[in-house]
Regions:
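Ser/Thr-rich low-complexity repeats and stalk/linker segments
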Residues: 73, 91-94, 124-143, 173, ...
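Gram-positive cell-envelope targeting signals
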Residues: 1-27, 175-177, 187, 209, ...
Length: 214
C-alpha cells in the first residue's frame, strides 16, 4: 500500500478525511457559504467541448478503462485520463442534489500564469510540507445542470481518479493540494493503492488541485 501522507503545516490543522490548513492567497477572504446550491444566470465557460463525456462513459485512466459517473468536460491533458468514480446512484446524496438536478463537472489544466492567486497557496503548502514535486495542476468546477442552466454547488464531494503521467516516479507518495476560493487549502491523501494513479476528493464548487509527489 502507498504510504499515508502526514505533515504539519504552519497553520491551524483540522483532521478529517484530509488535513485542512489556511494558506495565504491574493485577496484572500472568508470561507465558502454553507448554503446547498446557488443558481447562476449562465453556464460557466466549458473549455473545449470536444472533450465532453457523458455520464457512464468509458475513460482510459492510467491505461485502464474506468466509467466516469458525471457528465462534463474532461480537458486535462497533463494526466493519463481522469474519471469520477463515485457511483452514479450515490451522487444525489453526496452533492445534496435536488429534483431535476444532474451533476456536472469541468476539468482542465492550469498553471502559474492562469491561476496566479491559487498557485501562491499551492507553493506555500509545498514549502510547508518540506518540498515536493509538482506533477500537474487542474482547475475543477463541480456543479450541476438544471433546465439547461449551471447550478453552483457548495456542499459535498466526489472521488476523482487520475492517471499519473508516463514519466511519474511510482516509488513516491502522491497527494493533491486543493485550493478553494478565499484561500482555504487542503492536503488530500491518495485514496487508492494503484502506483500509476491517484484518487482524491473533489469538493463541490470551483477549486484548483495540484497533484504532488514526495
Amino acid at each position: 500500500m502507498k504510504k499515508v501522507l502526514a505533515a504539519t503545516l504552519a497553520a491551524t490543522m483540522v483532521m478529517a478525511s484530509a488535513m485542512t490548513v489556511c494558506a495565504t492567497t491574493e485577496n484572500a477572504g472568508s470561507g465558502s457559504s454553507s448554503s446547498s446550491t446557488t443558481q447562476e444566470t449562465s453556464t460557466p465557460a466549458t473549455y473545449a467541448e470536444a472533450n465532453s463525456q457523458s455520464a457512464g462513459a468509458s475513460v482510459k485512466v492510467g491505461g485502464v478503462a474506468v466509467q466516469t459517473s458525471i457528465a462534463g468536460v474532461y480537458a486535462a491533458e497533463s494526466l493519463k485520463g481522469v474519471a469520477v468514480t463515485t457511483p452514479a446512484a450515490d451522487l444525489a446524496a453526496a452533492l445534496s442534489l435536488t429534483s431535476g438536478q444532474k451533476a456536472a463537472i469541468i476539468i482542465y489544466d492550469t498553471d502559474q500564469k492562469k491561476s496566479t492567486a491559487a498557485m501562491v497557496s499551492v507553493n506555500a503548502a509545498i514549502e510547508a510540507l518540506g518540498g515536493a514535486d509538482l506533477v500537474s495542476t487542474l482547475n475543477i468546477d463541480l456543479g450541476a445542470k438544471q433546465n439547461g442552466k449551471w447550478v453552483t454547488l457548495s456542499n459535498g464531494s466526489v472521488a476523482l481518479k487520475a492517471g499519473l503521467p508516463k514519466t511519474a516516479d511510482t516509488t513516491k507518495t502522491y497527494s493533491s493540494i486543493c485550493v478553494q476560493p478565499g484561500g482555504a487549502t487542503t492536503i488530500l491523501e491518495d485514496q487508492d493503492t494503484d502506483p500509476t494513479t491517484v484518487t482524491f476528493a473533489v469538493q463541490a464548487g470551483l477549486g484548483t488541485y495540484a497533484i504532488i509527489a514526495k
